[in-house]
Amino acid sequence: MAKATSGAAGLGLKLILLLPLLGEAPLGLYFSRDAYWERLYVDQPAGTPLLYVHALRDAPGEVPSFRLGQHLYGVYRTRLHENDWIRINETTGLLYLNQSLDHSSWEQLSIRNGGFPLLTIFLQVFLGSTAQREGECHWPGCTRVYFSFINDTFPNCSSFKAQDLCIPETAVSFRVRENRPPGTFYHFHMLPVQFLCPNISVKYSLLGGDSLPFRCDPDCLEVSTRWALDRELREKYVLEALCIVAGPGANKETVTLSFPVTVYDEDDSAPTFSGGVGTASAVVEFKRKEGTVVATLQVFDADVVPASGELVRRYTNTLLSGDSWAQQTFRVEHSPIETLVQVNNNSVRATMHNYKLILNRSLSISESRVLQLAVLVNDSDFQGPGAGGILVLHFNVSVLPVTLNLPRAYSFPVNKRARRYAQIGKVCVENCQEFSGVSIQYKLQPSSINCTALGVVTSPEDTSGTLFVNDTEALRRPECTKLQYTVVATDRQTRRQTQASLVVTVEGTSITEEVGCPKSCAVNKRRPECEECGGLGSPTGRCEWRQGDGKGITRNFSTCSPSTRTCPDGHCDAVESRDANICPQDCLRADIVGGHERGERQGIKAGYGICNCFPDEKKCFCEPEDSQGPLCDALCRTIITAALFSLIISILLSIFCVCHHHKHGHKPPIASAEMTFCRPAQGFPISYSSSGTRRPSLDSTENQVPVDSFKIPEDPKWEFPRKNLVLGKTLGEGEFGKVVKATAFRLKGRAGYTTVAVKMLKENASQSELRDLLSEFNLLKQVNHPHVIKLYGACSQDGPLLLIVEYAKYGSLRGFLRDSRKIGPAYVSGGGSRNSSSLDHPDERVLTMGDLISFAWQISRGMQYLAEMKLVHRDLAARNILVAEGRKMKISDFGLSRDVYEEDSYVKKSKGRIPVKWMAIESLFDHIYTTQSDVWSFGVLLWEIVTLGGNPYPGIPPERLFNLLKTGHRMERPDNCSEEMYRLMLQCWKQEPDKRPVFADISKDLEKMMVKSRDYLDLAASTPSDSLLYDDGLSEEETPLVDCNNAPLPRSLPSTWIENKLYGMSDPNWPGESPVPLTRADGTSTGFPRYANDSVYANWMVSPSAAKLMDTFDS
């Protein structure tokens, strides 16, 4: 206290020392404008007056002296010519033409100016006779005169309009300093016109009367100020005049002119205390951080804010204190703000100076002091008398200590299903939310070492502690139903402590985690998959969906969150920052695709539609929601309900009639309705009608009719002349049909020959197989998509039925992928060899992950089209995808596809062998085939693509697969498969069909993966060490075929299930006999050859024992 008083007592001495530093601004003449404009014409006579420049005085008695610069310059300050064309009267400031200028003068300057047709030059005019450098021309002691040099003669006097004679070409404004003697600052007349057109009379008169400080001479040629102006009273004026033009005739025209006049400021106003307050009191308690503003005092100055370069020199502030602790702890910061004040109904600029007393360092919670501080403020440019520019500000400061206190006890509930990093509550010392510069550390001391399920982390924003789940296993222990802790809060600087008890009650029951759920809730893009999964930070074990408002780019965007209470909220808190998977919407420093507004340092501040993130790949997407408004109102829904009710009644009546008819009518022999997984022996074909029901087979009368006797109606649109078709080598064959390579002449109007593939029946085929071929023919007529095999035509008359379809150069996708594995890096470099017949000449480059994703995307687009056409494929697999030139994917083998315009599912209740490992659960157990069961198969196809043609579920026999799938077992992620691709597979393998994505959504997800895919897939490195993945001991084509009696069948069938018997892609070069003779297990011999390595076919074909198991399920 004594030190502060003694410091204030020395104020008088300091003021005396500072007074000699006060000075006055230099005085001098100045120009009223910083630029003048006029026109020059070719052949203007020498001596033509051009314009006046005017100088105003700083003090009475000053006489101006004008001097021209030595050179003419271009607008880009290029020196063009020595100035011998323009002269000036050094006393009056009149500029006139020294010599007449011709076209050569203009051309000479134009060339030096870069050849621009519009030539503008300028020269500089200085005040005073002393020499100045031309590069230092600045207002107020120098001005520039610009001339538009026109390559034409002076216009005819009769061509001028009144506006041309009154209004200058360029806007004119004036600058007048306050408190200066009156003087002339403008000459109205355009001197060249007055000189060259004496018959035109132009006169002026001022408007506004005596209220304005301007006047004209008797002829009103020159305008002057009437008195010294005061900027603090009025800063801007408008000079208005009336221009009267009279020509040789009697007509007169008037034009009104206006010019702005700005009064420039000088430092003639002393600073004063704002509101008369020069003392401030402050208390330093909870805000103790360096940079904290302790108190503020304001100083008002009627003068304008100085330029930034002048501010530090003009205004100084000094902390007057002899206390070293105060000097080290506090500093003063000065910040001026321009403000407007009203004076006589005029807005005038002024300055409000803010002087802030700021902590120069952080203070500990134990610091305690009381002191008085004085700050000297000096306006060093003040032009008034004495020490009017000096003020002293006073600050009374009290620094108080801080005591740490916690409440006696805390109590929180926690859900047993909570995931790691789930936030359950906060602990906070008293007033912690007001702390700044105080560092508190929280710790938990558990009462039992077996129940340490919680952790605590200190929030740097409000010095609170956030409690979170750190060990989910401890939550599930029976003895940990009530967690007891001691919370200890410690000040890091002084080590002072306080503590309280904490009781956390564990509630709820455990739940089974969904298969295939991502680690982060933010990955989920759709509400159903969000709410059925959990993720890091979820307090309930399930993610929460936040539905946005859908209004453009908004902070309330739709997203999946562990807890909408904390995520996303635009702030990455202390818990969320521990793992990017908790809340990437707030914390991820990622690339954001789509409409968004990025957070200040991280996360998404605002987004468009639905925003989801992939933390491992550091990417976020904000895309529109796939939603539509209500399509039907209440009346519409009532009508639809009534119609559906009527339809249901009609269907029930129809079913009753049909059942009654079958009960009393003749029953033809039909196949068994039991679902078995074996194939009838050769010669007993299985087929379906277009409605999806089993046709009569085996002993059906129509199947005994020769194919040749069946008359096919001709379709002129698709009929192709048989003579124009030349058949070639066989590409693949099945039991009753084959595919051959062919050339077609003038196909679809094309010139020359076109390579095609032709599907046909073998001689042993029956009408059942012919109907299958006709069914595919009729189906292919309806489809047209770049990723579905294309029908060109058919030969249906005067011979066997031939279907002409698109030729796929590289065969099946499965063979293409496997052969790509064999290629390896050596093939890319040209050193490899190929023996496979599946690929003749593929692109000579190694497959990249982008290629594989592209294959999947193409297939998904084709399946999306088929789904929109209401077609179910039922056998989607890599073996049934063909690869055309340019690596174009083509969906083929529609022998099983069924038109579902009438019904969305096909129930298969017939005998026949099926591809178990590609089938959906509902197809295996309930015989239901829908577009969503195709989605399941597509997931297996994705697995085949990523593993380059691997066999699904390697090493697992089909009879075990049923129970594994039912209990939630799914294939594991292959080594070279991305997390995002594997998540898509798992979504396709959801047990409930309605929770699987549709093909449209799958296409969108694959499009994103294609954009993000950059790295090459190392085919050699991706080869699994387990040979089962690719061979299972045998290739799929070499698997044994057995009938219902376990009798082996000939290996002439394709590598698809038996209903695809017509168009398989088996190798035509297979040997006719087995290299190793085999006997049956029962010791009986067969008349059919087998192969030694024919066991893996069971990997996707169910054995008779499994068939019996499925019969049990049926019953």
From Swiss-Prot:
The chain's disulfide connectivity reads 137-142, 157-197, 166-243
Recorded hits in Pfam families, A to Z, give: Cadherin (PF00028), PK_Tyr_Ser-Thr (PF07714), RET_CLD1 (PF17756), RET_CLD3 (PF17812), RET_CLD4 (PF17813), RET_CRD (PF22540)
Q: Where does ATP bind?
A: 731-739, 759
Q: Which InterPro entries match?
A: Cadherin-like_dom, Cadherin-like_sf, Kinase-like_dom_sf, Prot_kinase_dom, Protein_kinase_ATP_BS, Ret_CLD1, Ret_CLD3, RET_CLD4
| The protein's name | Proto-oncogene tyrosine-protein kinase receptor Ret
Where in the numbering of this chain does the Protein kinase domain appear? Answer: 725-1017
For the modification Phosphoserine, the affected residues are 697
Taken from the record's topology, the Cytoplasmic segments are 660-1115
List glycan-bearing residues: 89, 98, 151, 156, 199, 345, 360, 378, 396, 450, 470, 556, 689
Q: Which keywords accompany this UniProt record?
A: ATP-binding, Calcium, Cell adhesion, Cell membrane, Disulfide bond, Endosome, Glycoprotein, Kinase, Membrane, Metal-binding, Nucleotide-binding, Phosphoprotein, Proto-oncogene, Receptor, Signal, Transferase, Transmembrane, Transmembrane helix, Tyrosine-protein kinase
Tell me which Gene Ontology terms the entry assigns under biological process. anatomical structure morphogenesis; cell surface receptor protein tyrosine kinase signaling pathway; cellular response to retinoic acid; embryonic epithelial tube formation; enteric nervous system development; GDF15-GFRAL signaling pathway; glial cell-derived neurotrophic factor receptor signaling pathway; homophilic cell adhesion via plasma membrane adhesion molecules
How does this polypeptide assemble, per the annotation? Phosphorylated form interacts with the PBT domain of DOK2, DOK4 and DOK5. The phosphorylated form interacts with PLCG1 and GRB7. Interacts (not phosphorylated) with PTK2/FAK1 (via FERM domain). Extracellular cell-membrane anchored RET cadherin fragments form complex in neurons with reduced trophic status, preferentially at the contact sites between somas. Interacts with AIP in the pituitary gland; this interaction prevents the formation of the AIP-survivin complex. Interacts (inactive) with CBLC and CD2AP; dissociates upon activation by GDNF which increases CBLC:CD2AP interaction.
What does this protein's UniProt record list under function? Receptor tyrosine-protein kinase involved in numerous cellular mechanisms including cell proliferation, neuronal navigation, cell migration, and cell differentiation in response to glia cell line-derived growth family factors (GDNF, NRTN, ARTN, PSPN and GDF15). In contrast to most receptor tyrosine kinases, RET requires not only its cognate ligands but also coreceptors, for activation.
Chain spans, region Cadherin-like region 4 (CLD4): 407-508
Q: Where is this region: Cadherin-like region 3 (CLD3)?
A: 266-380
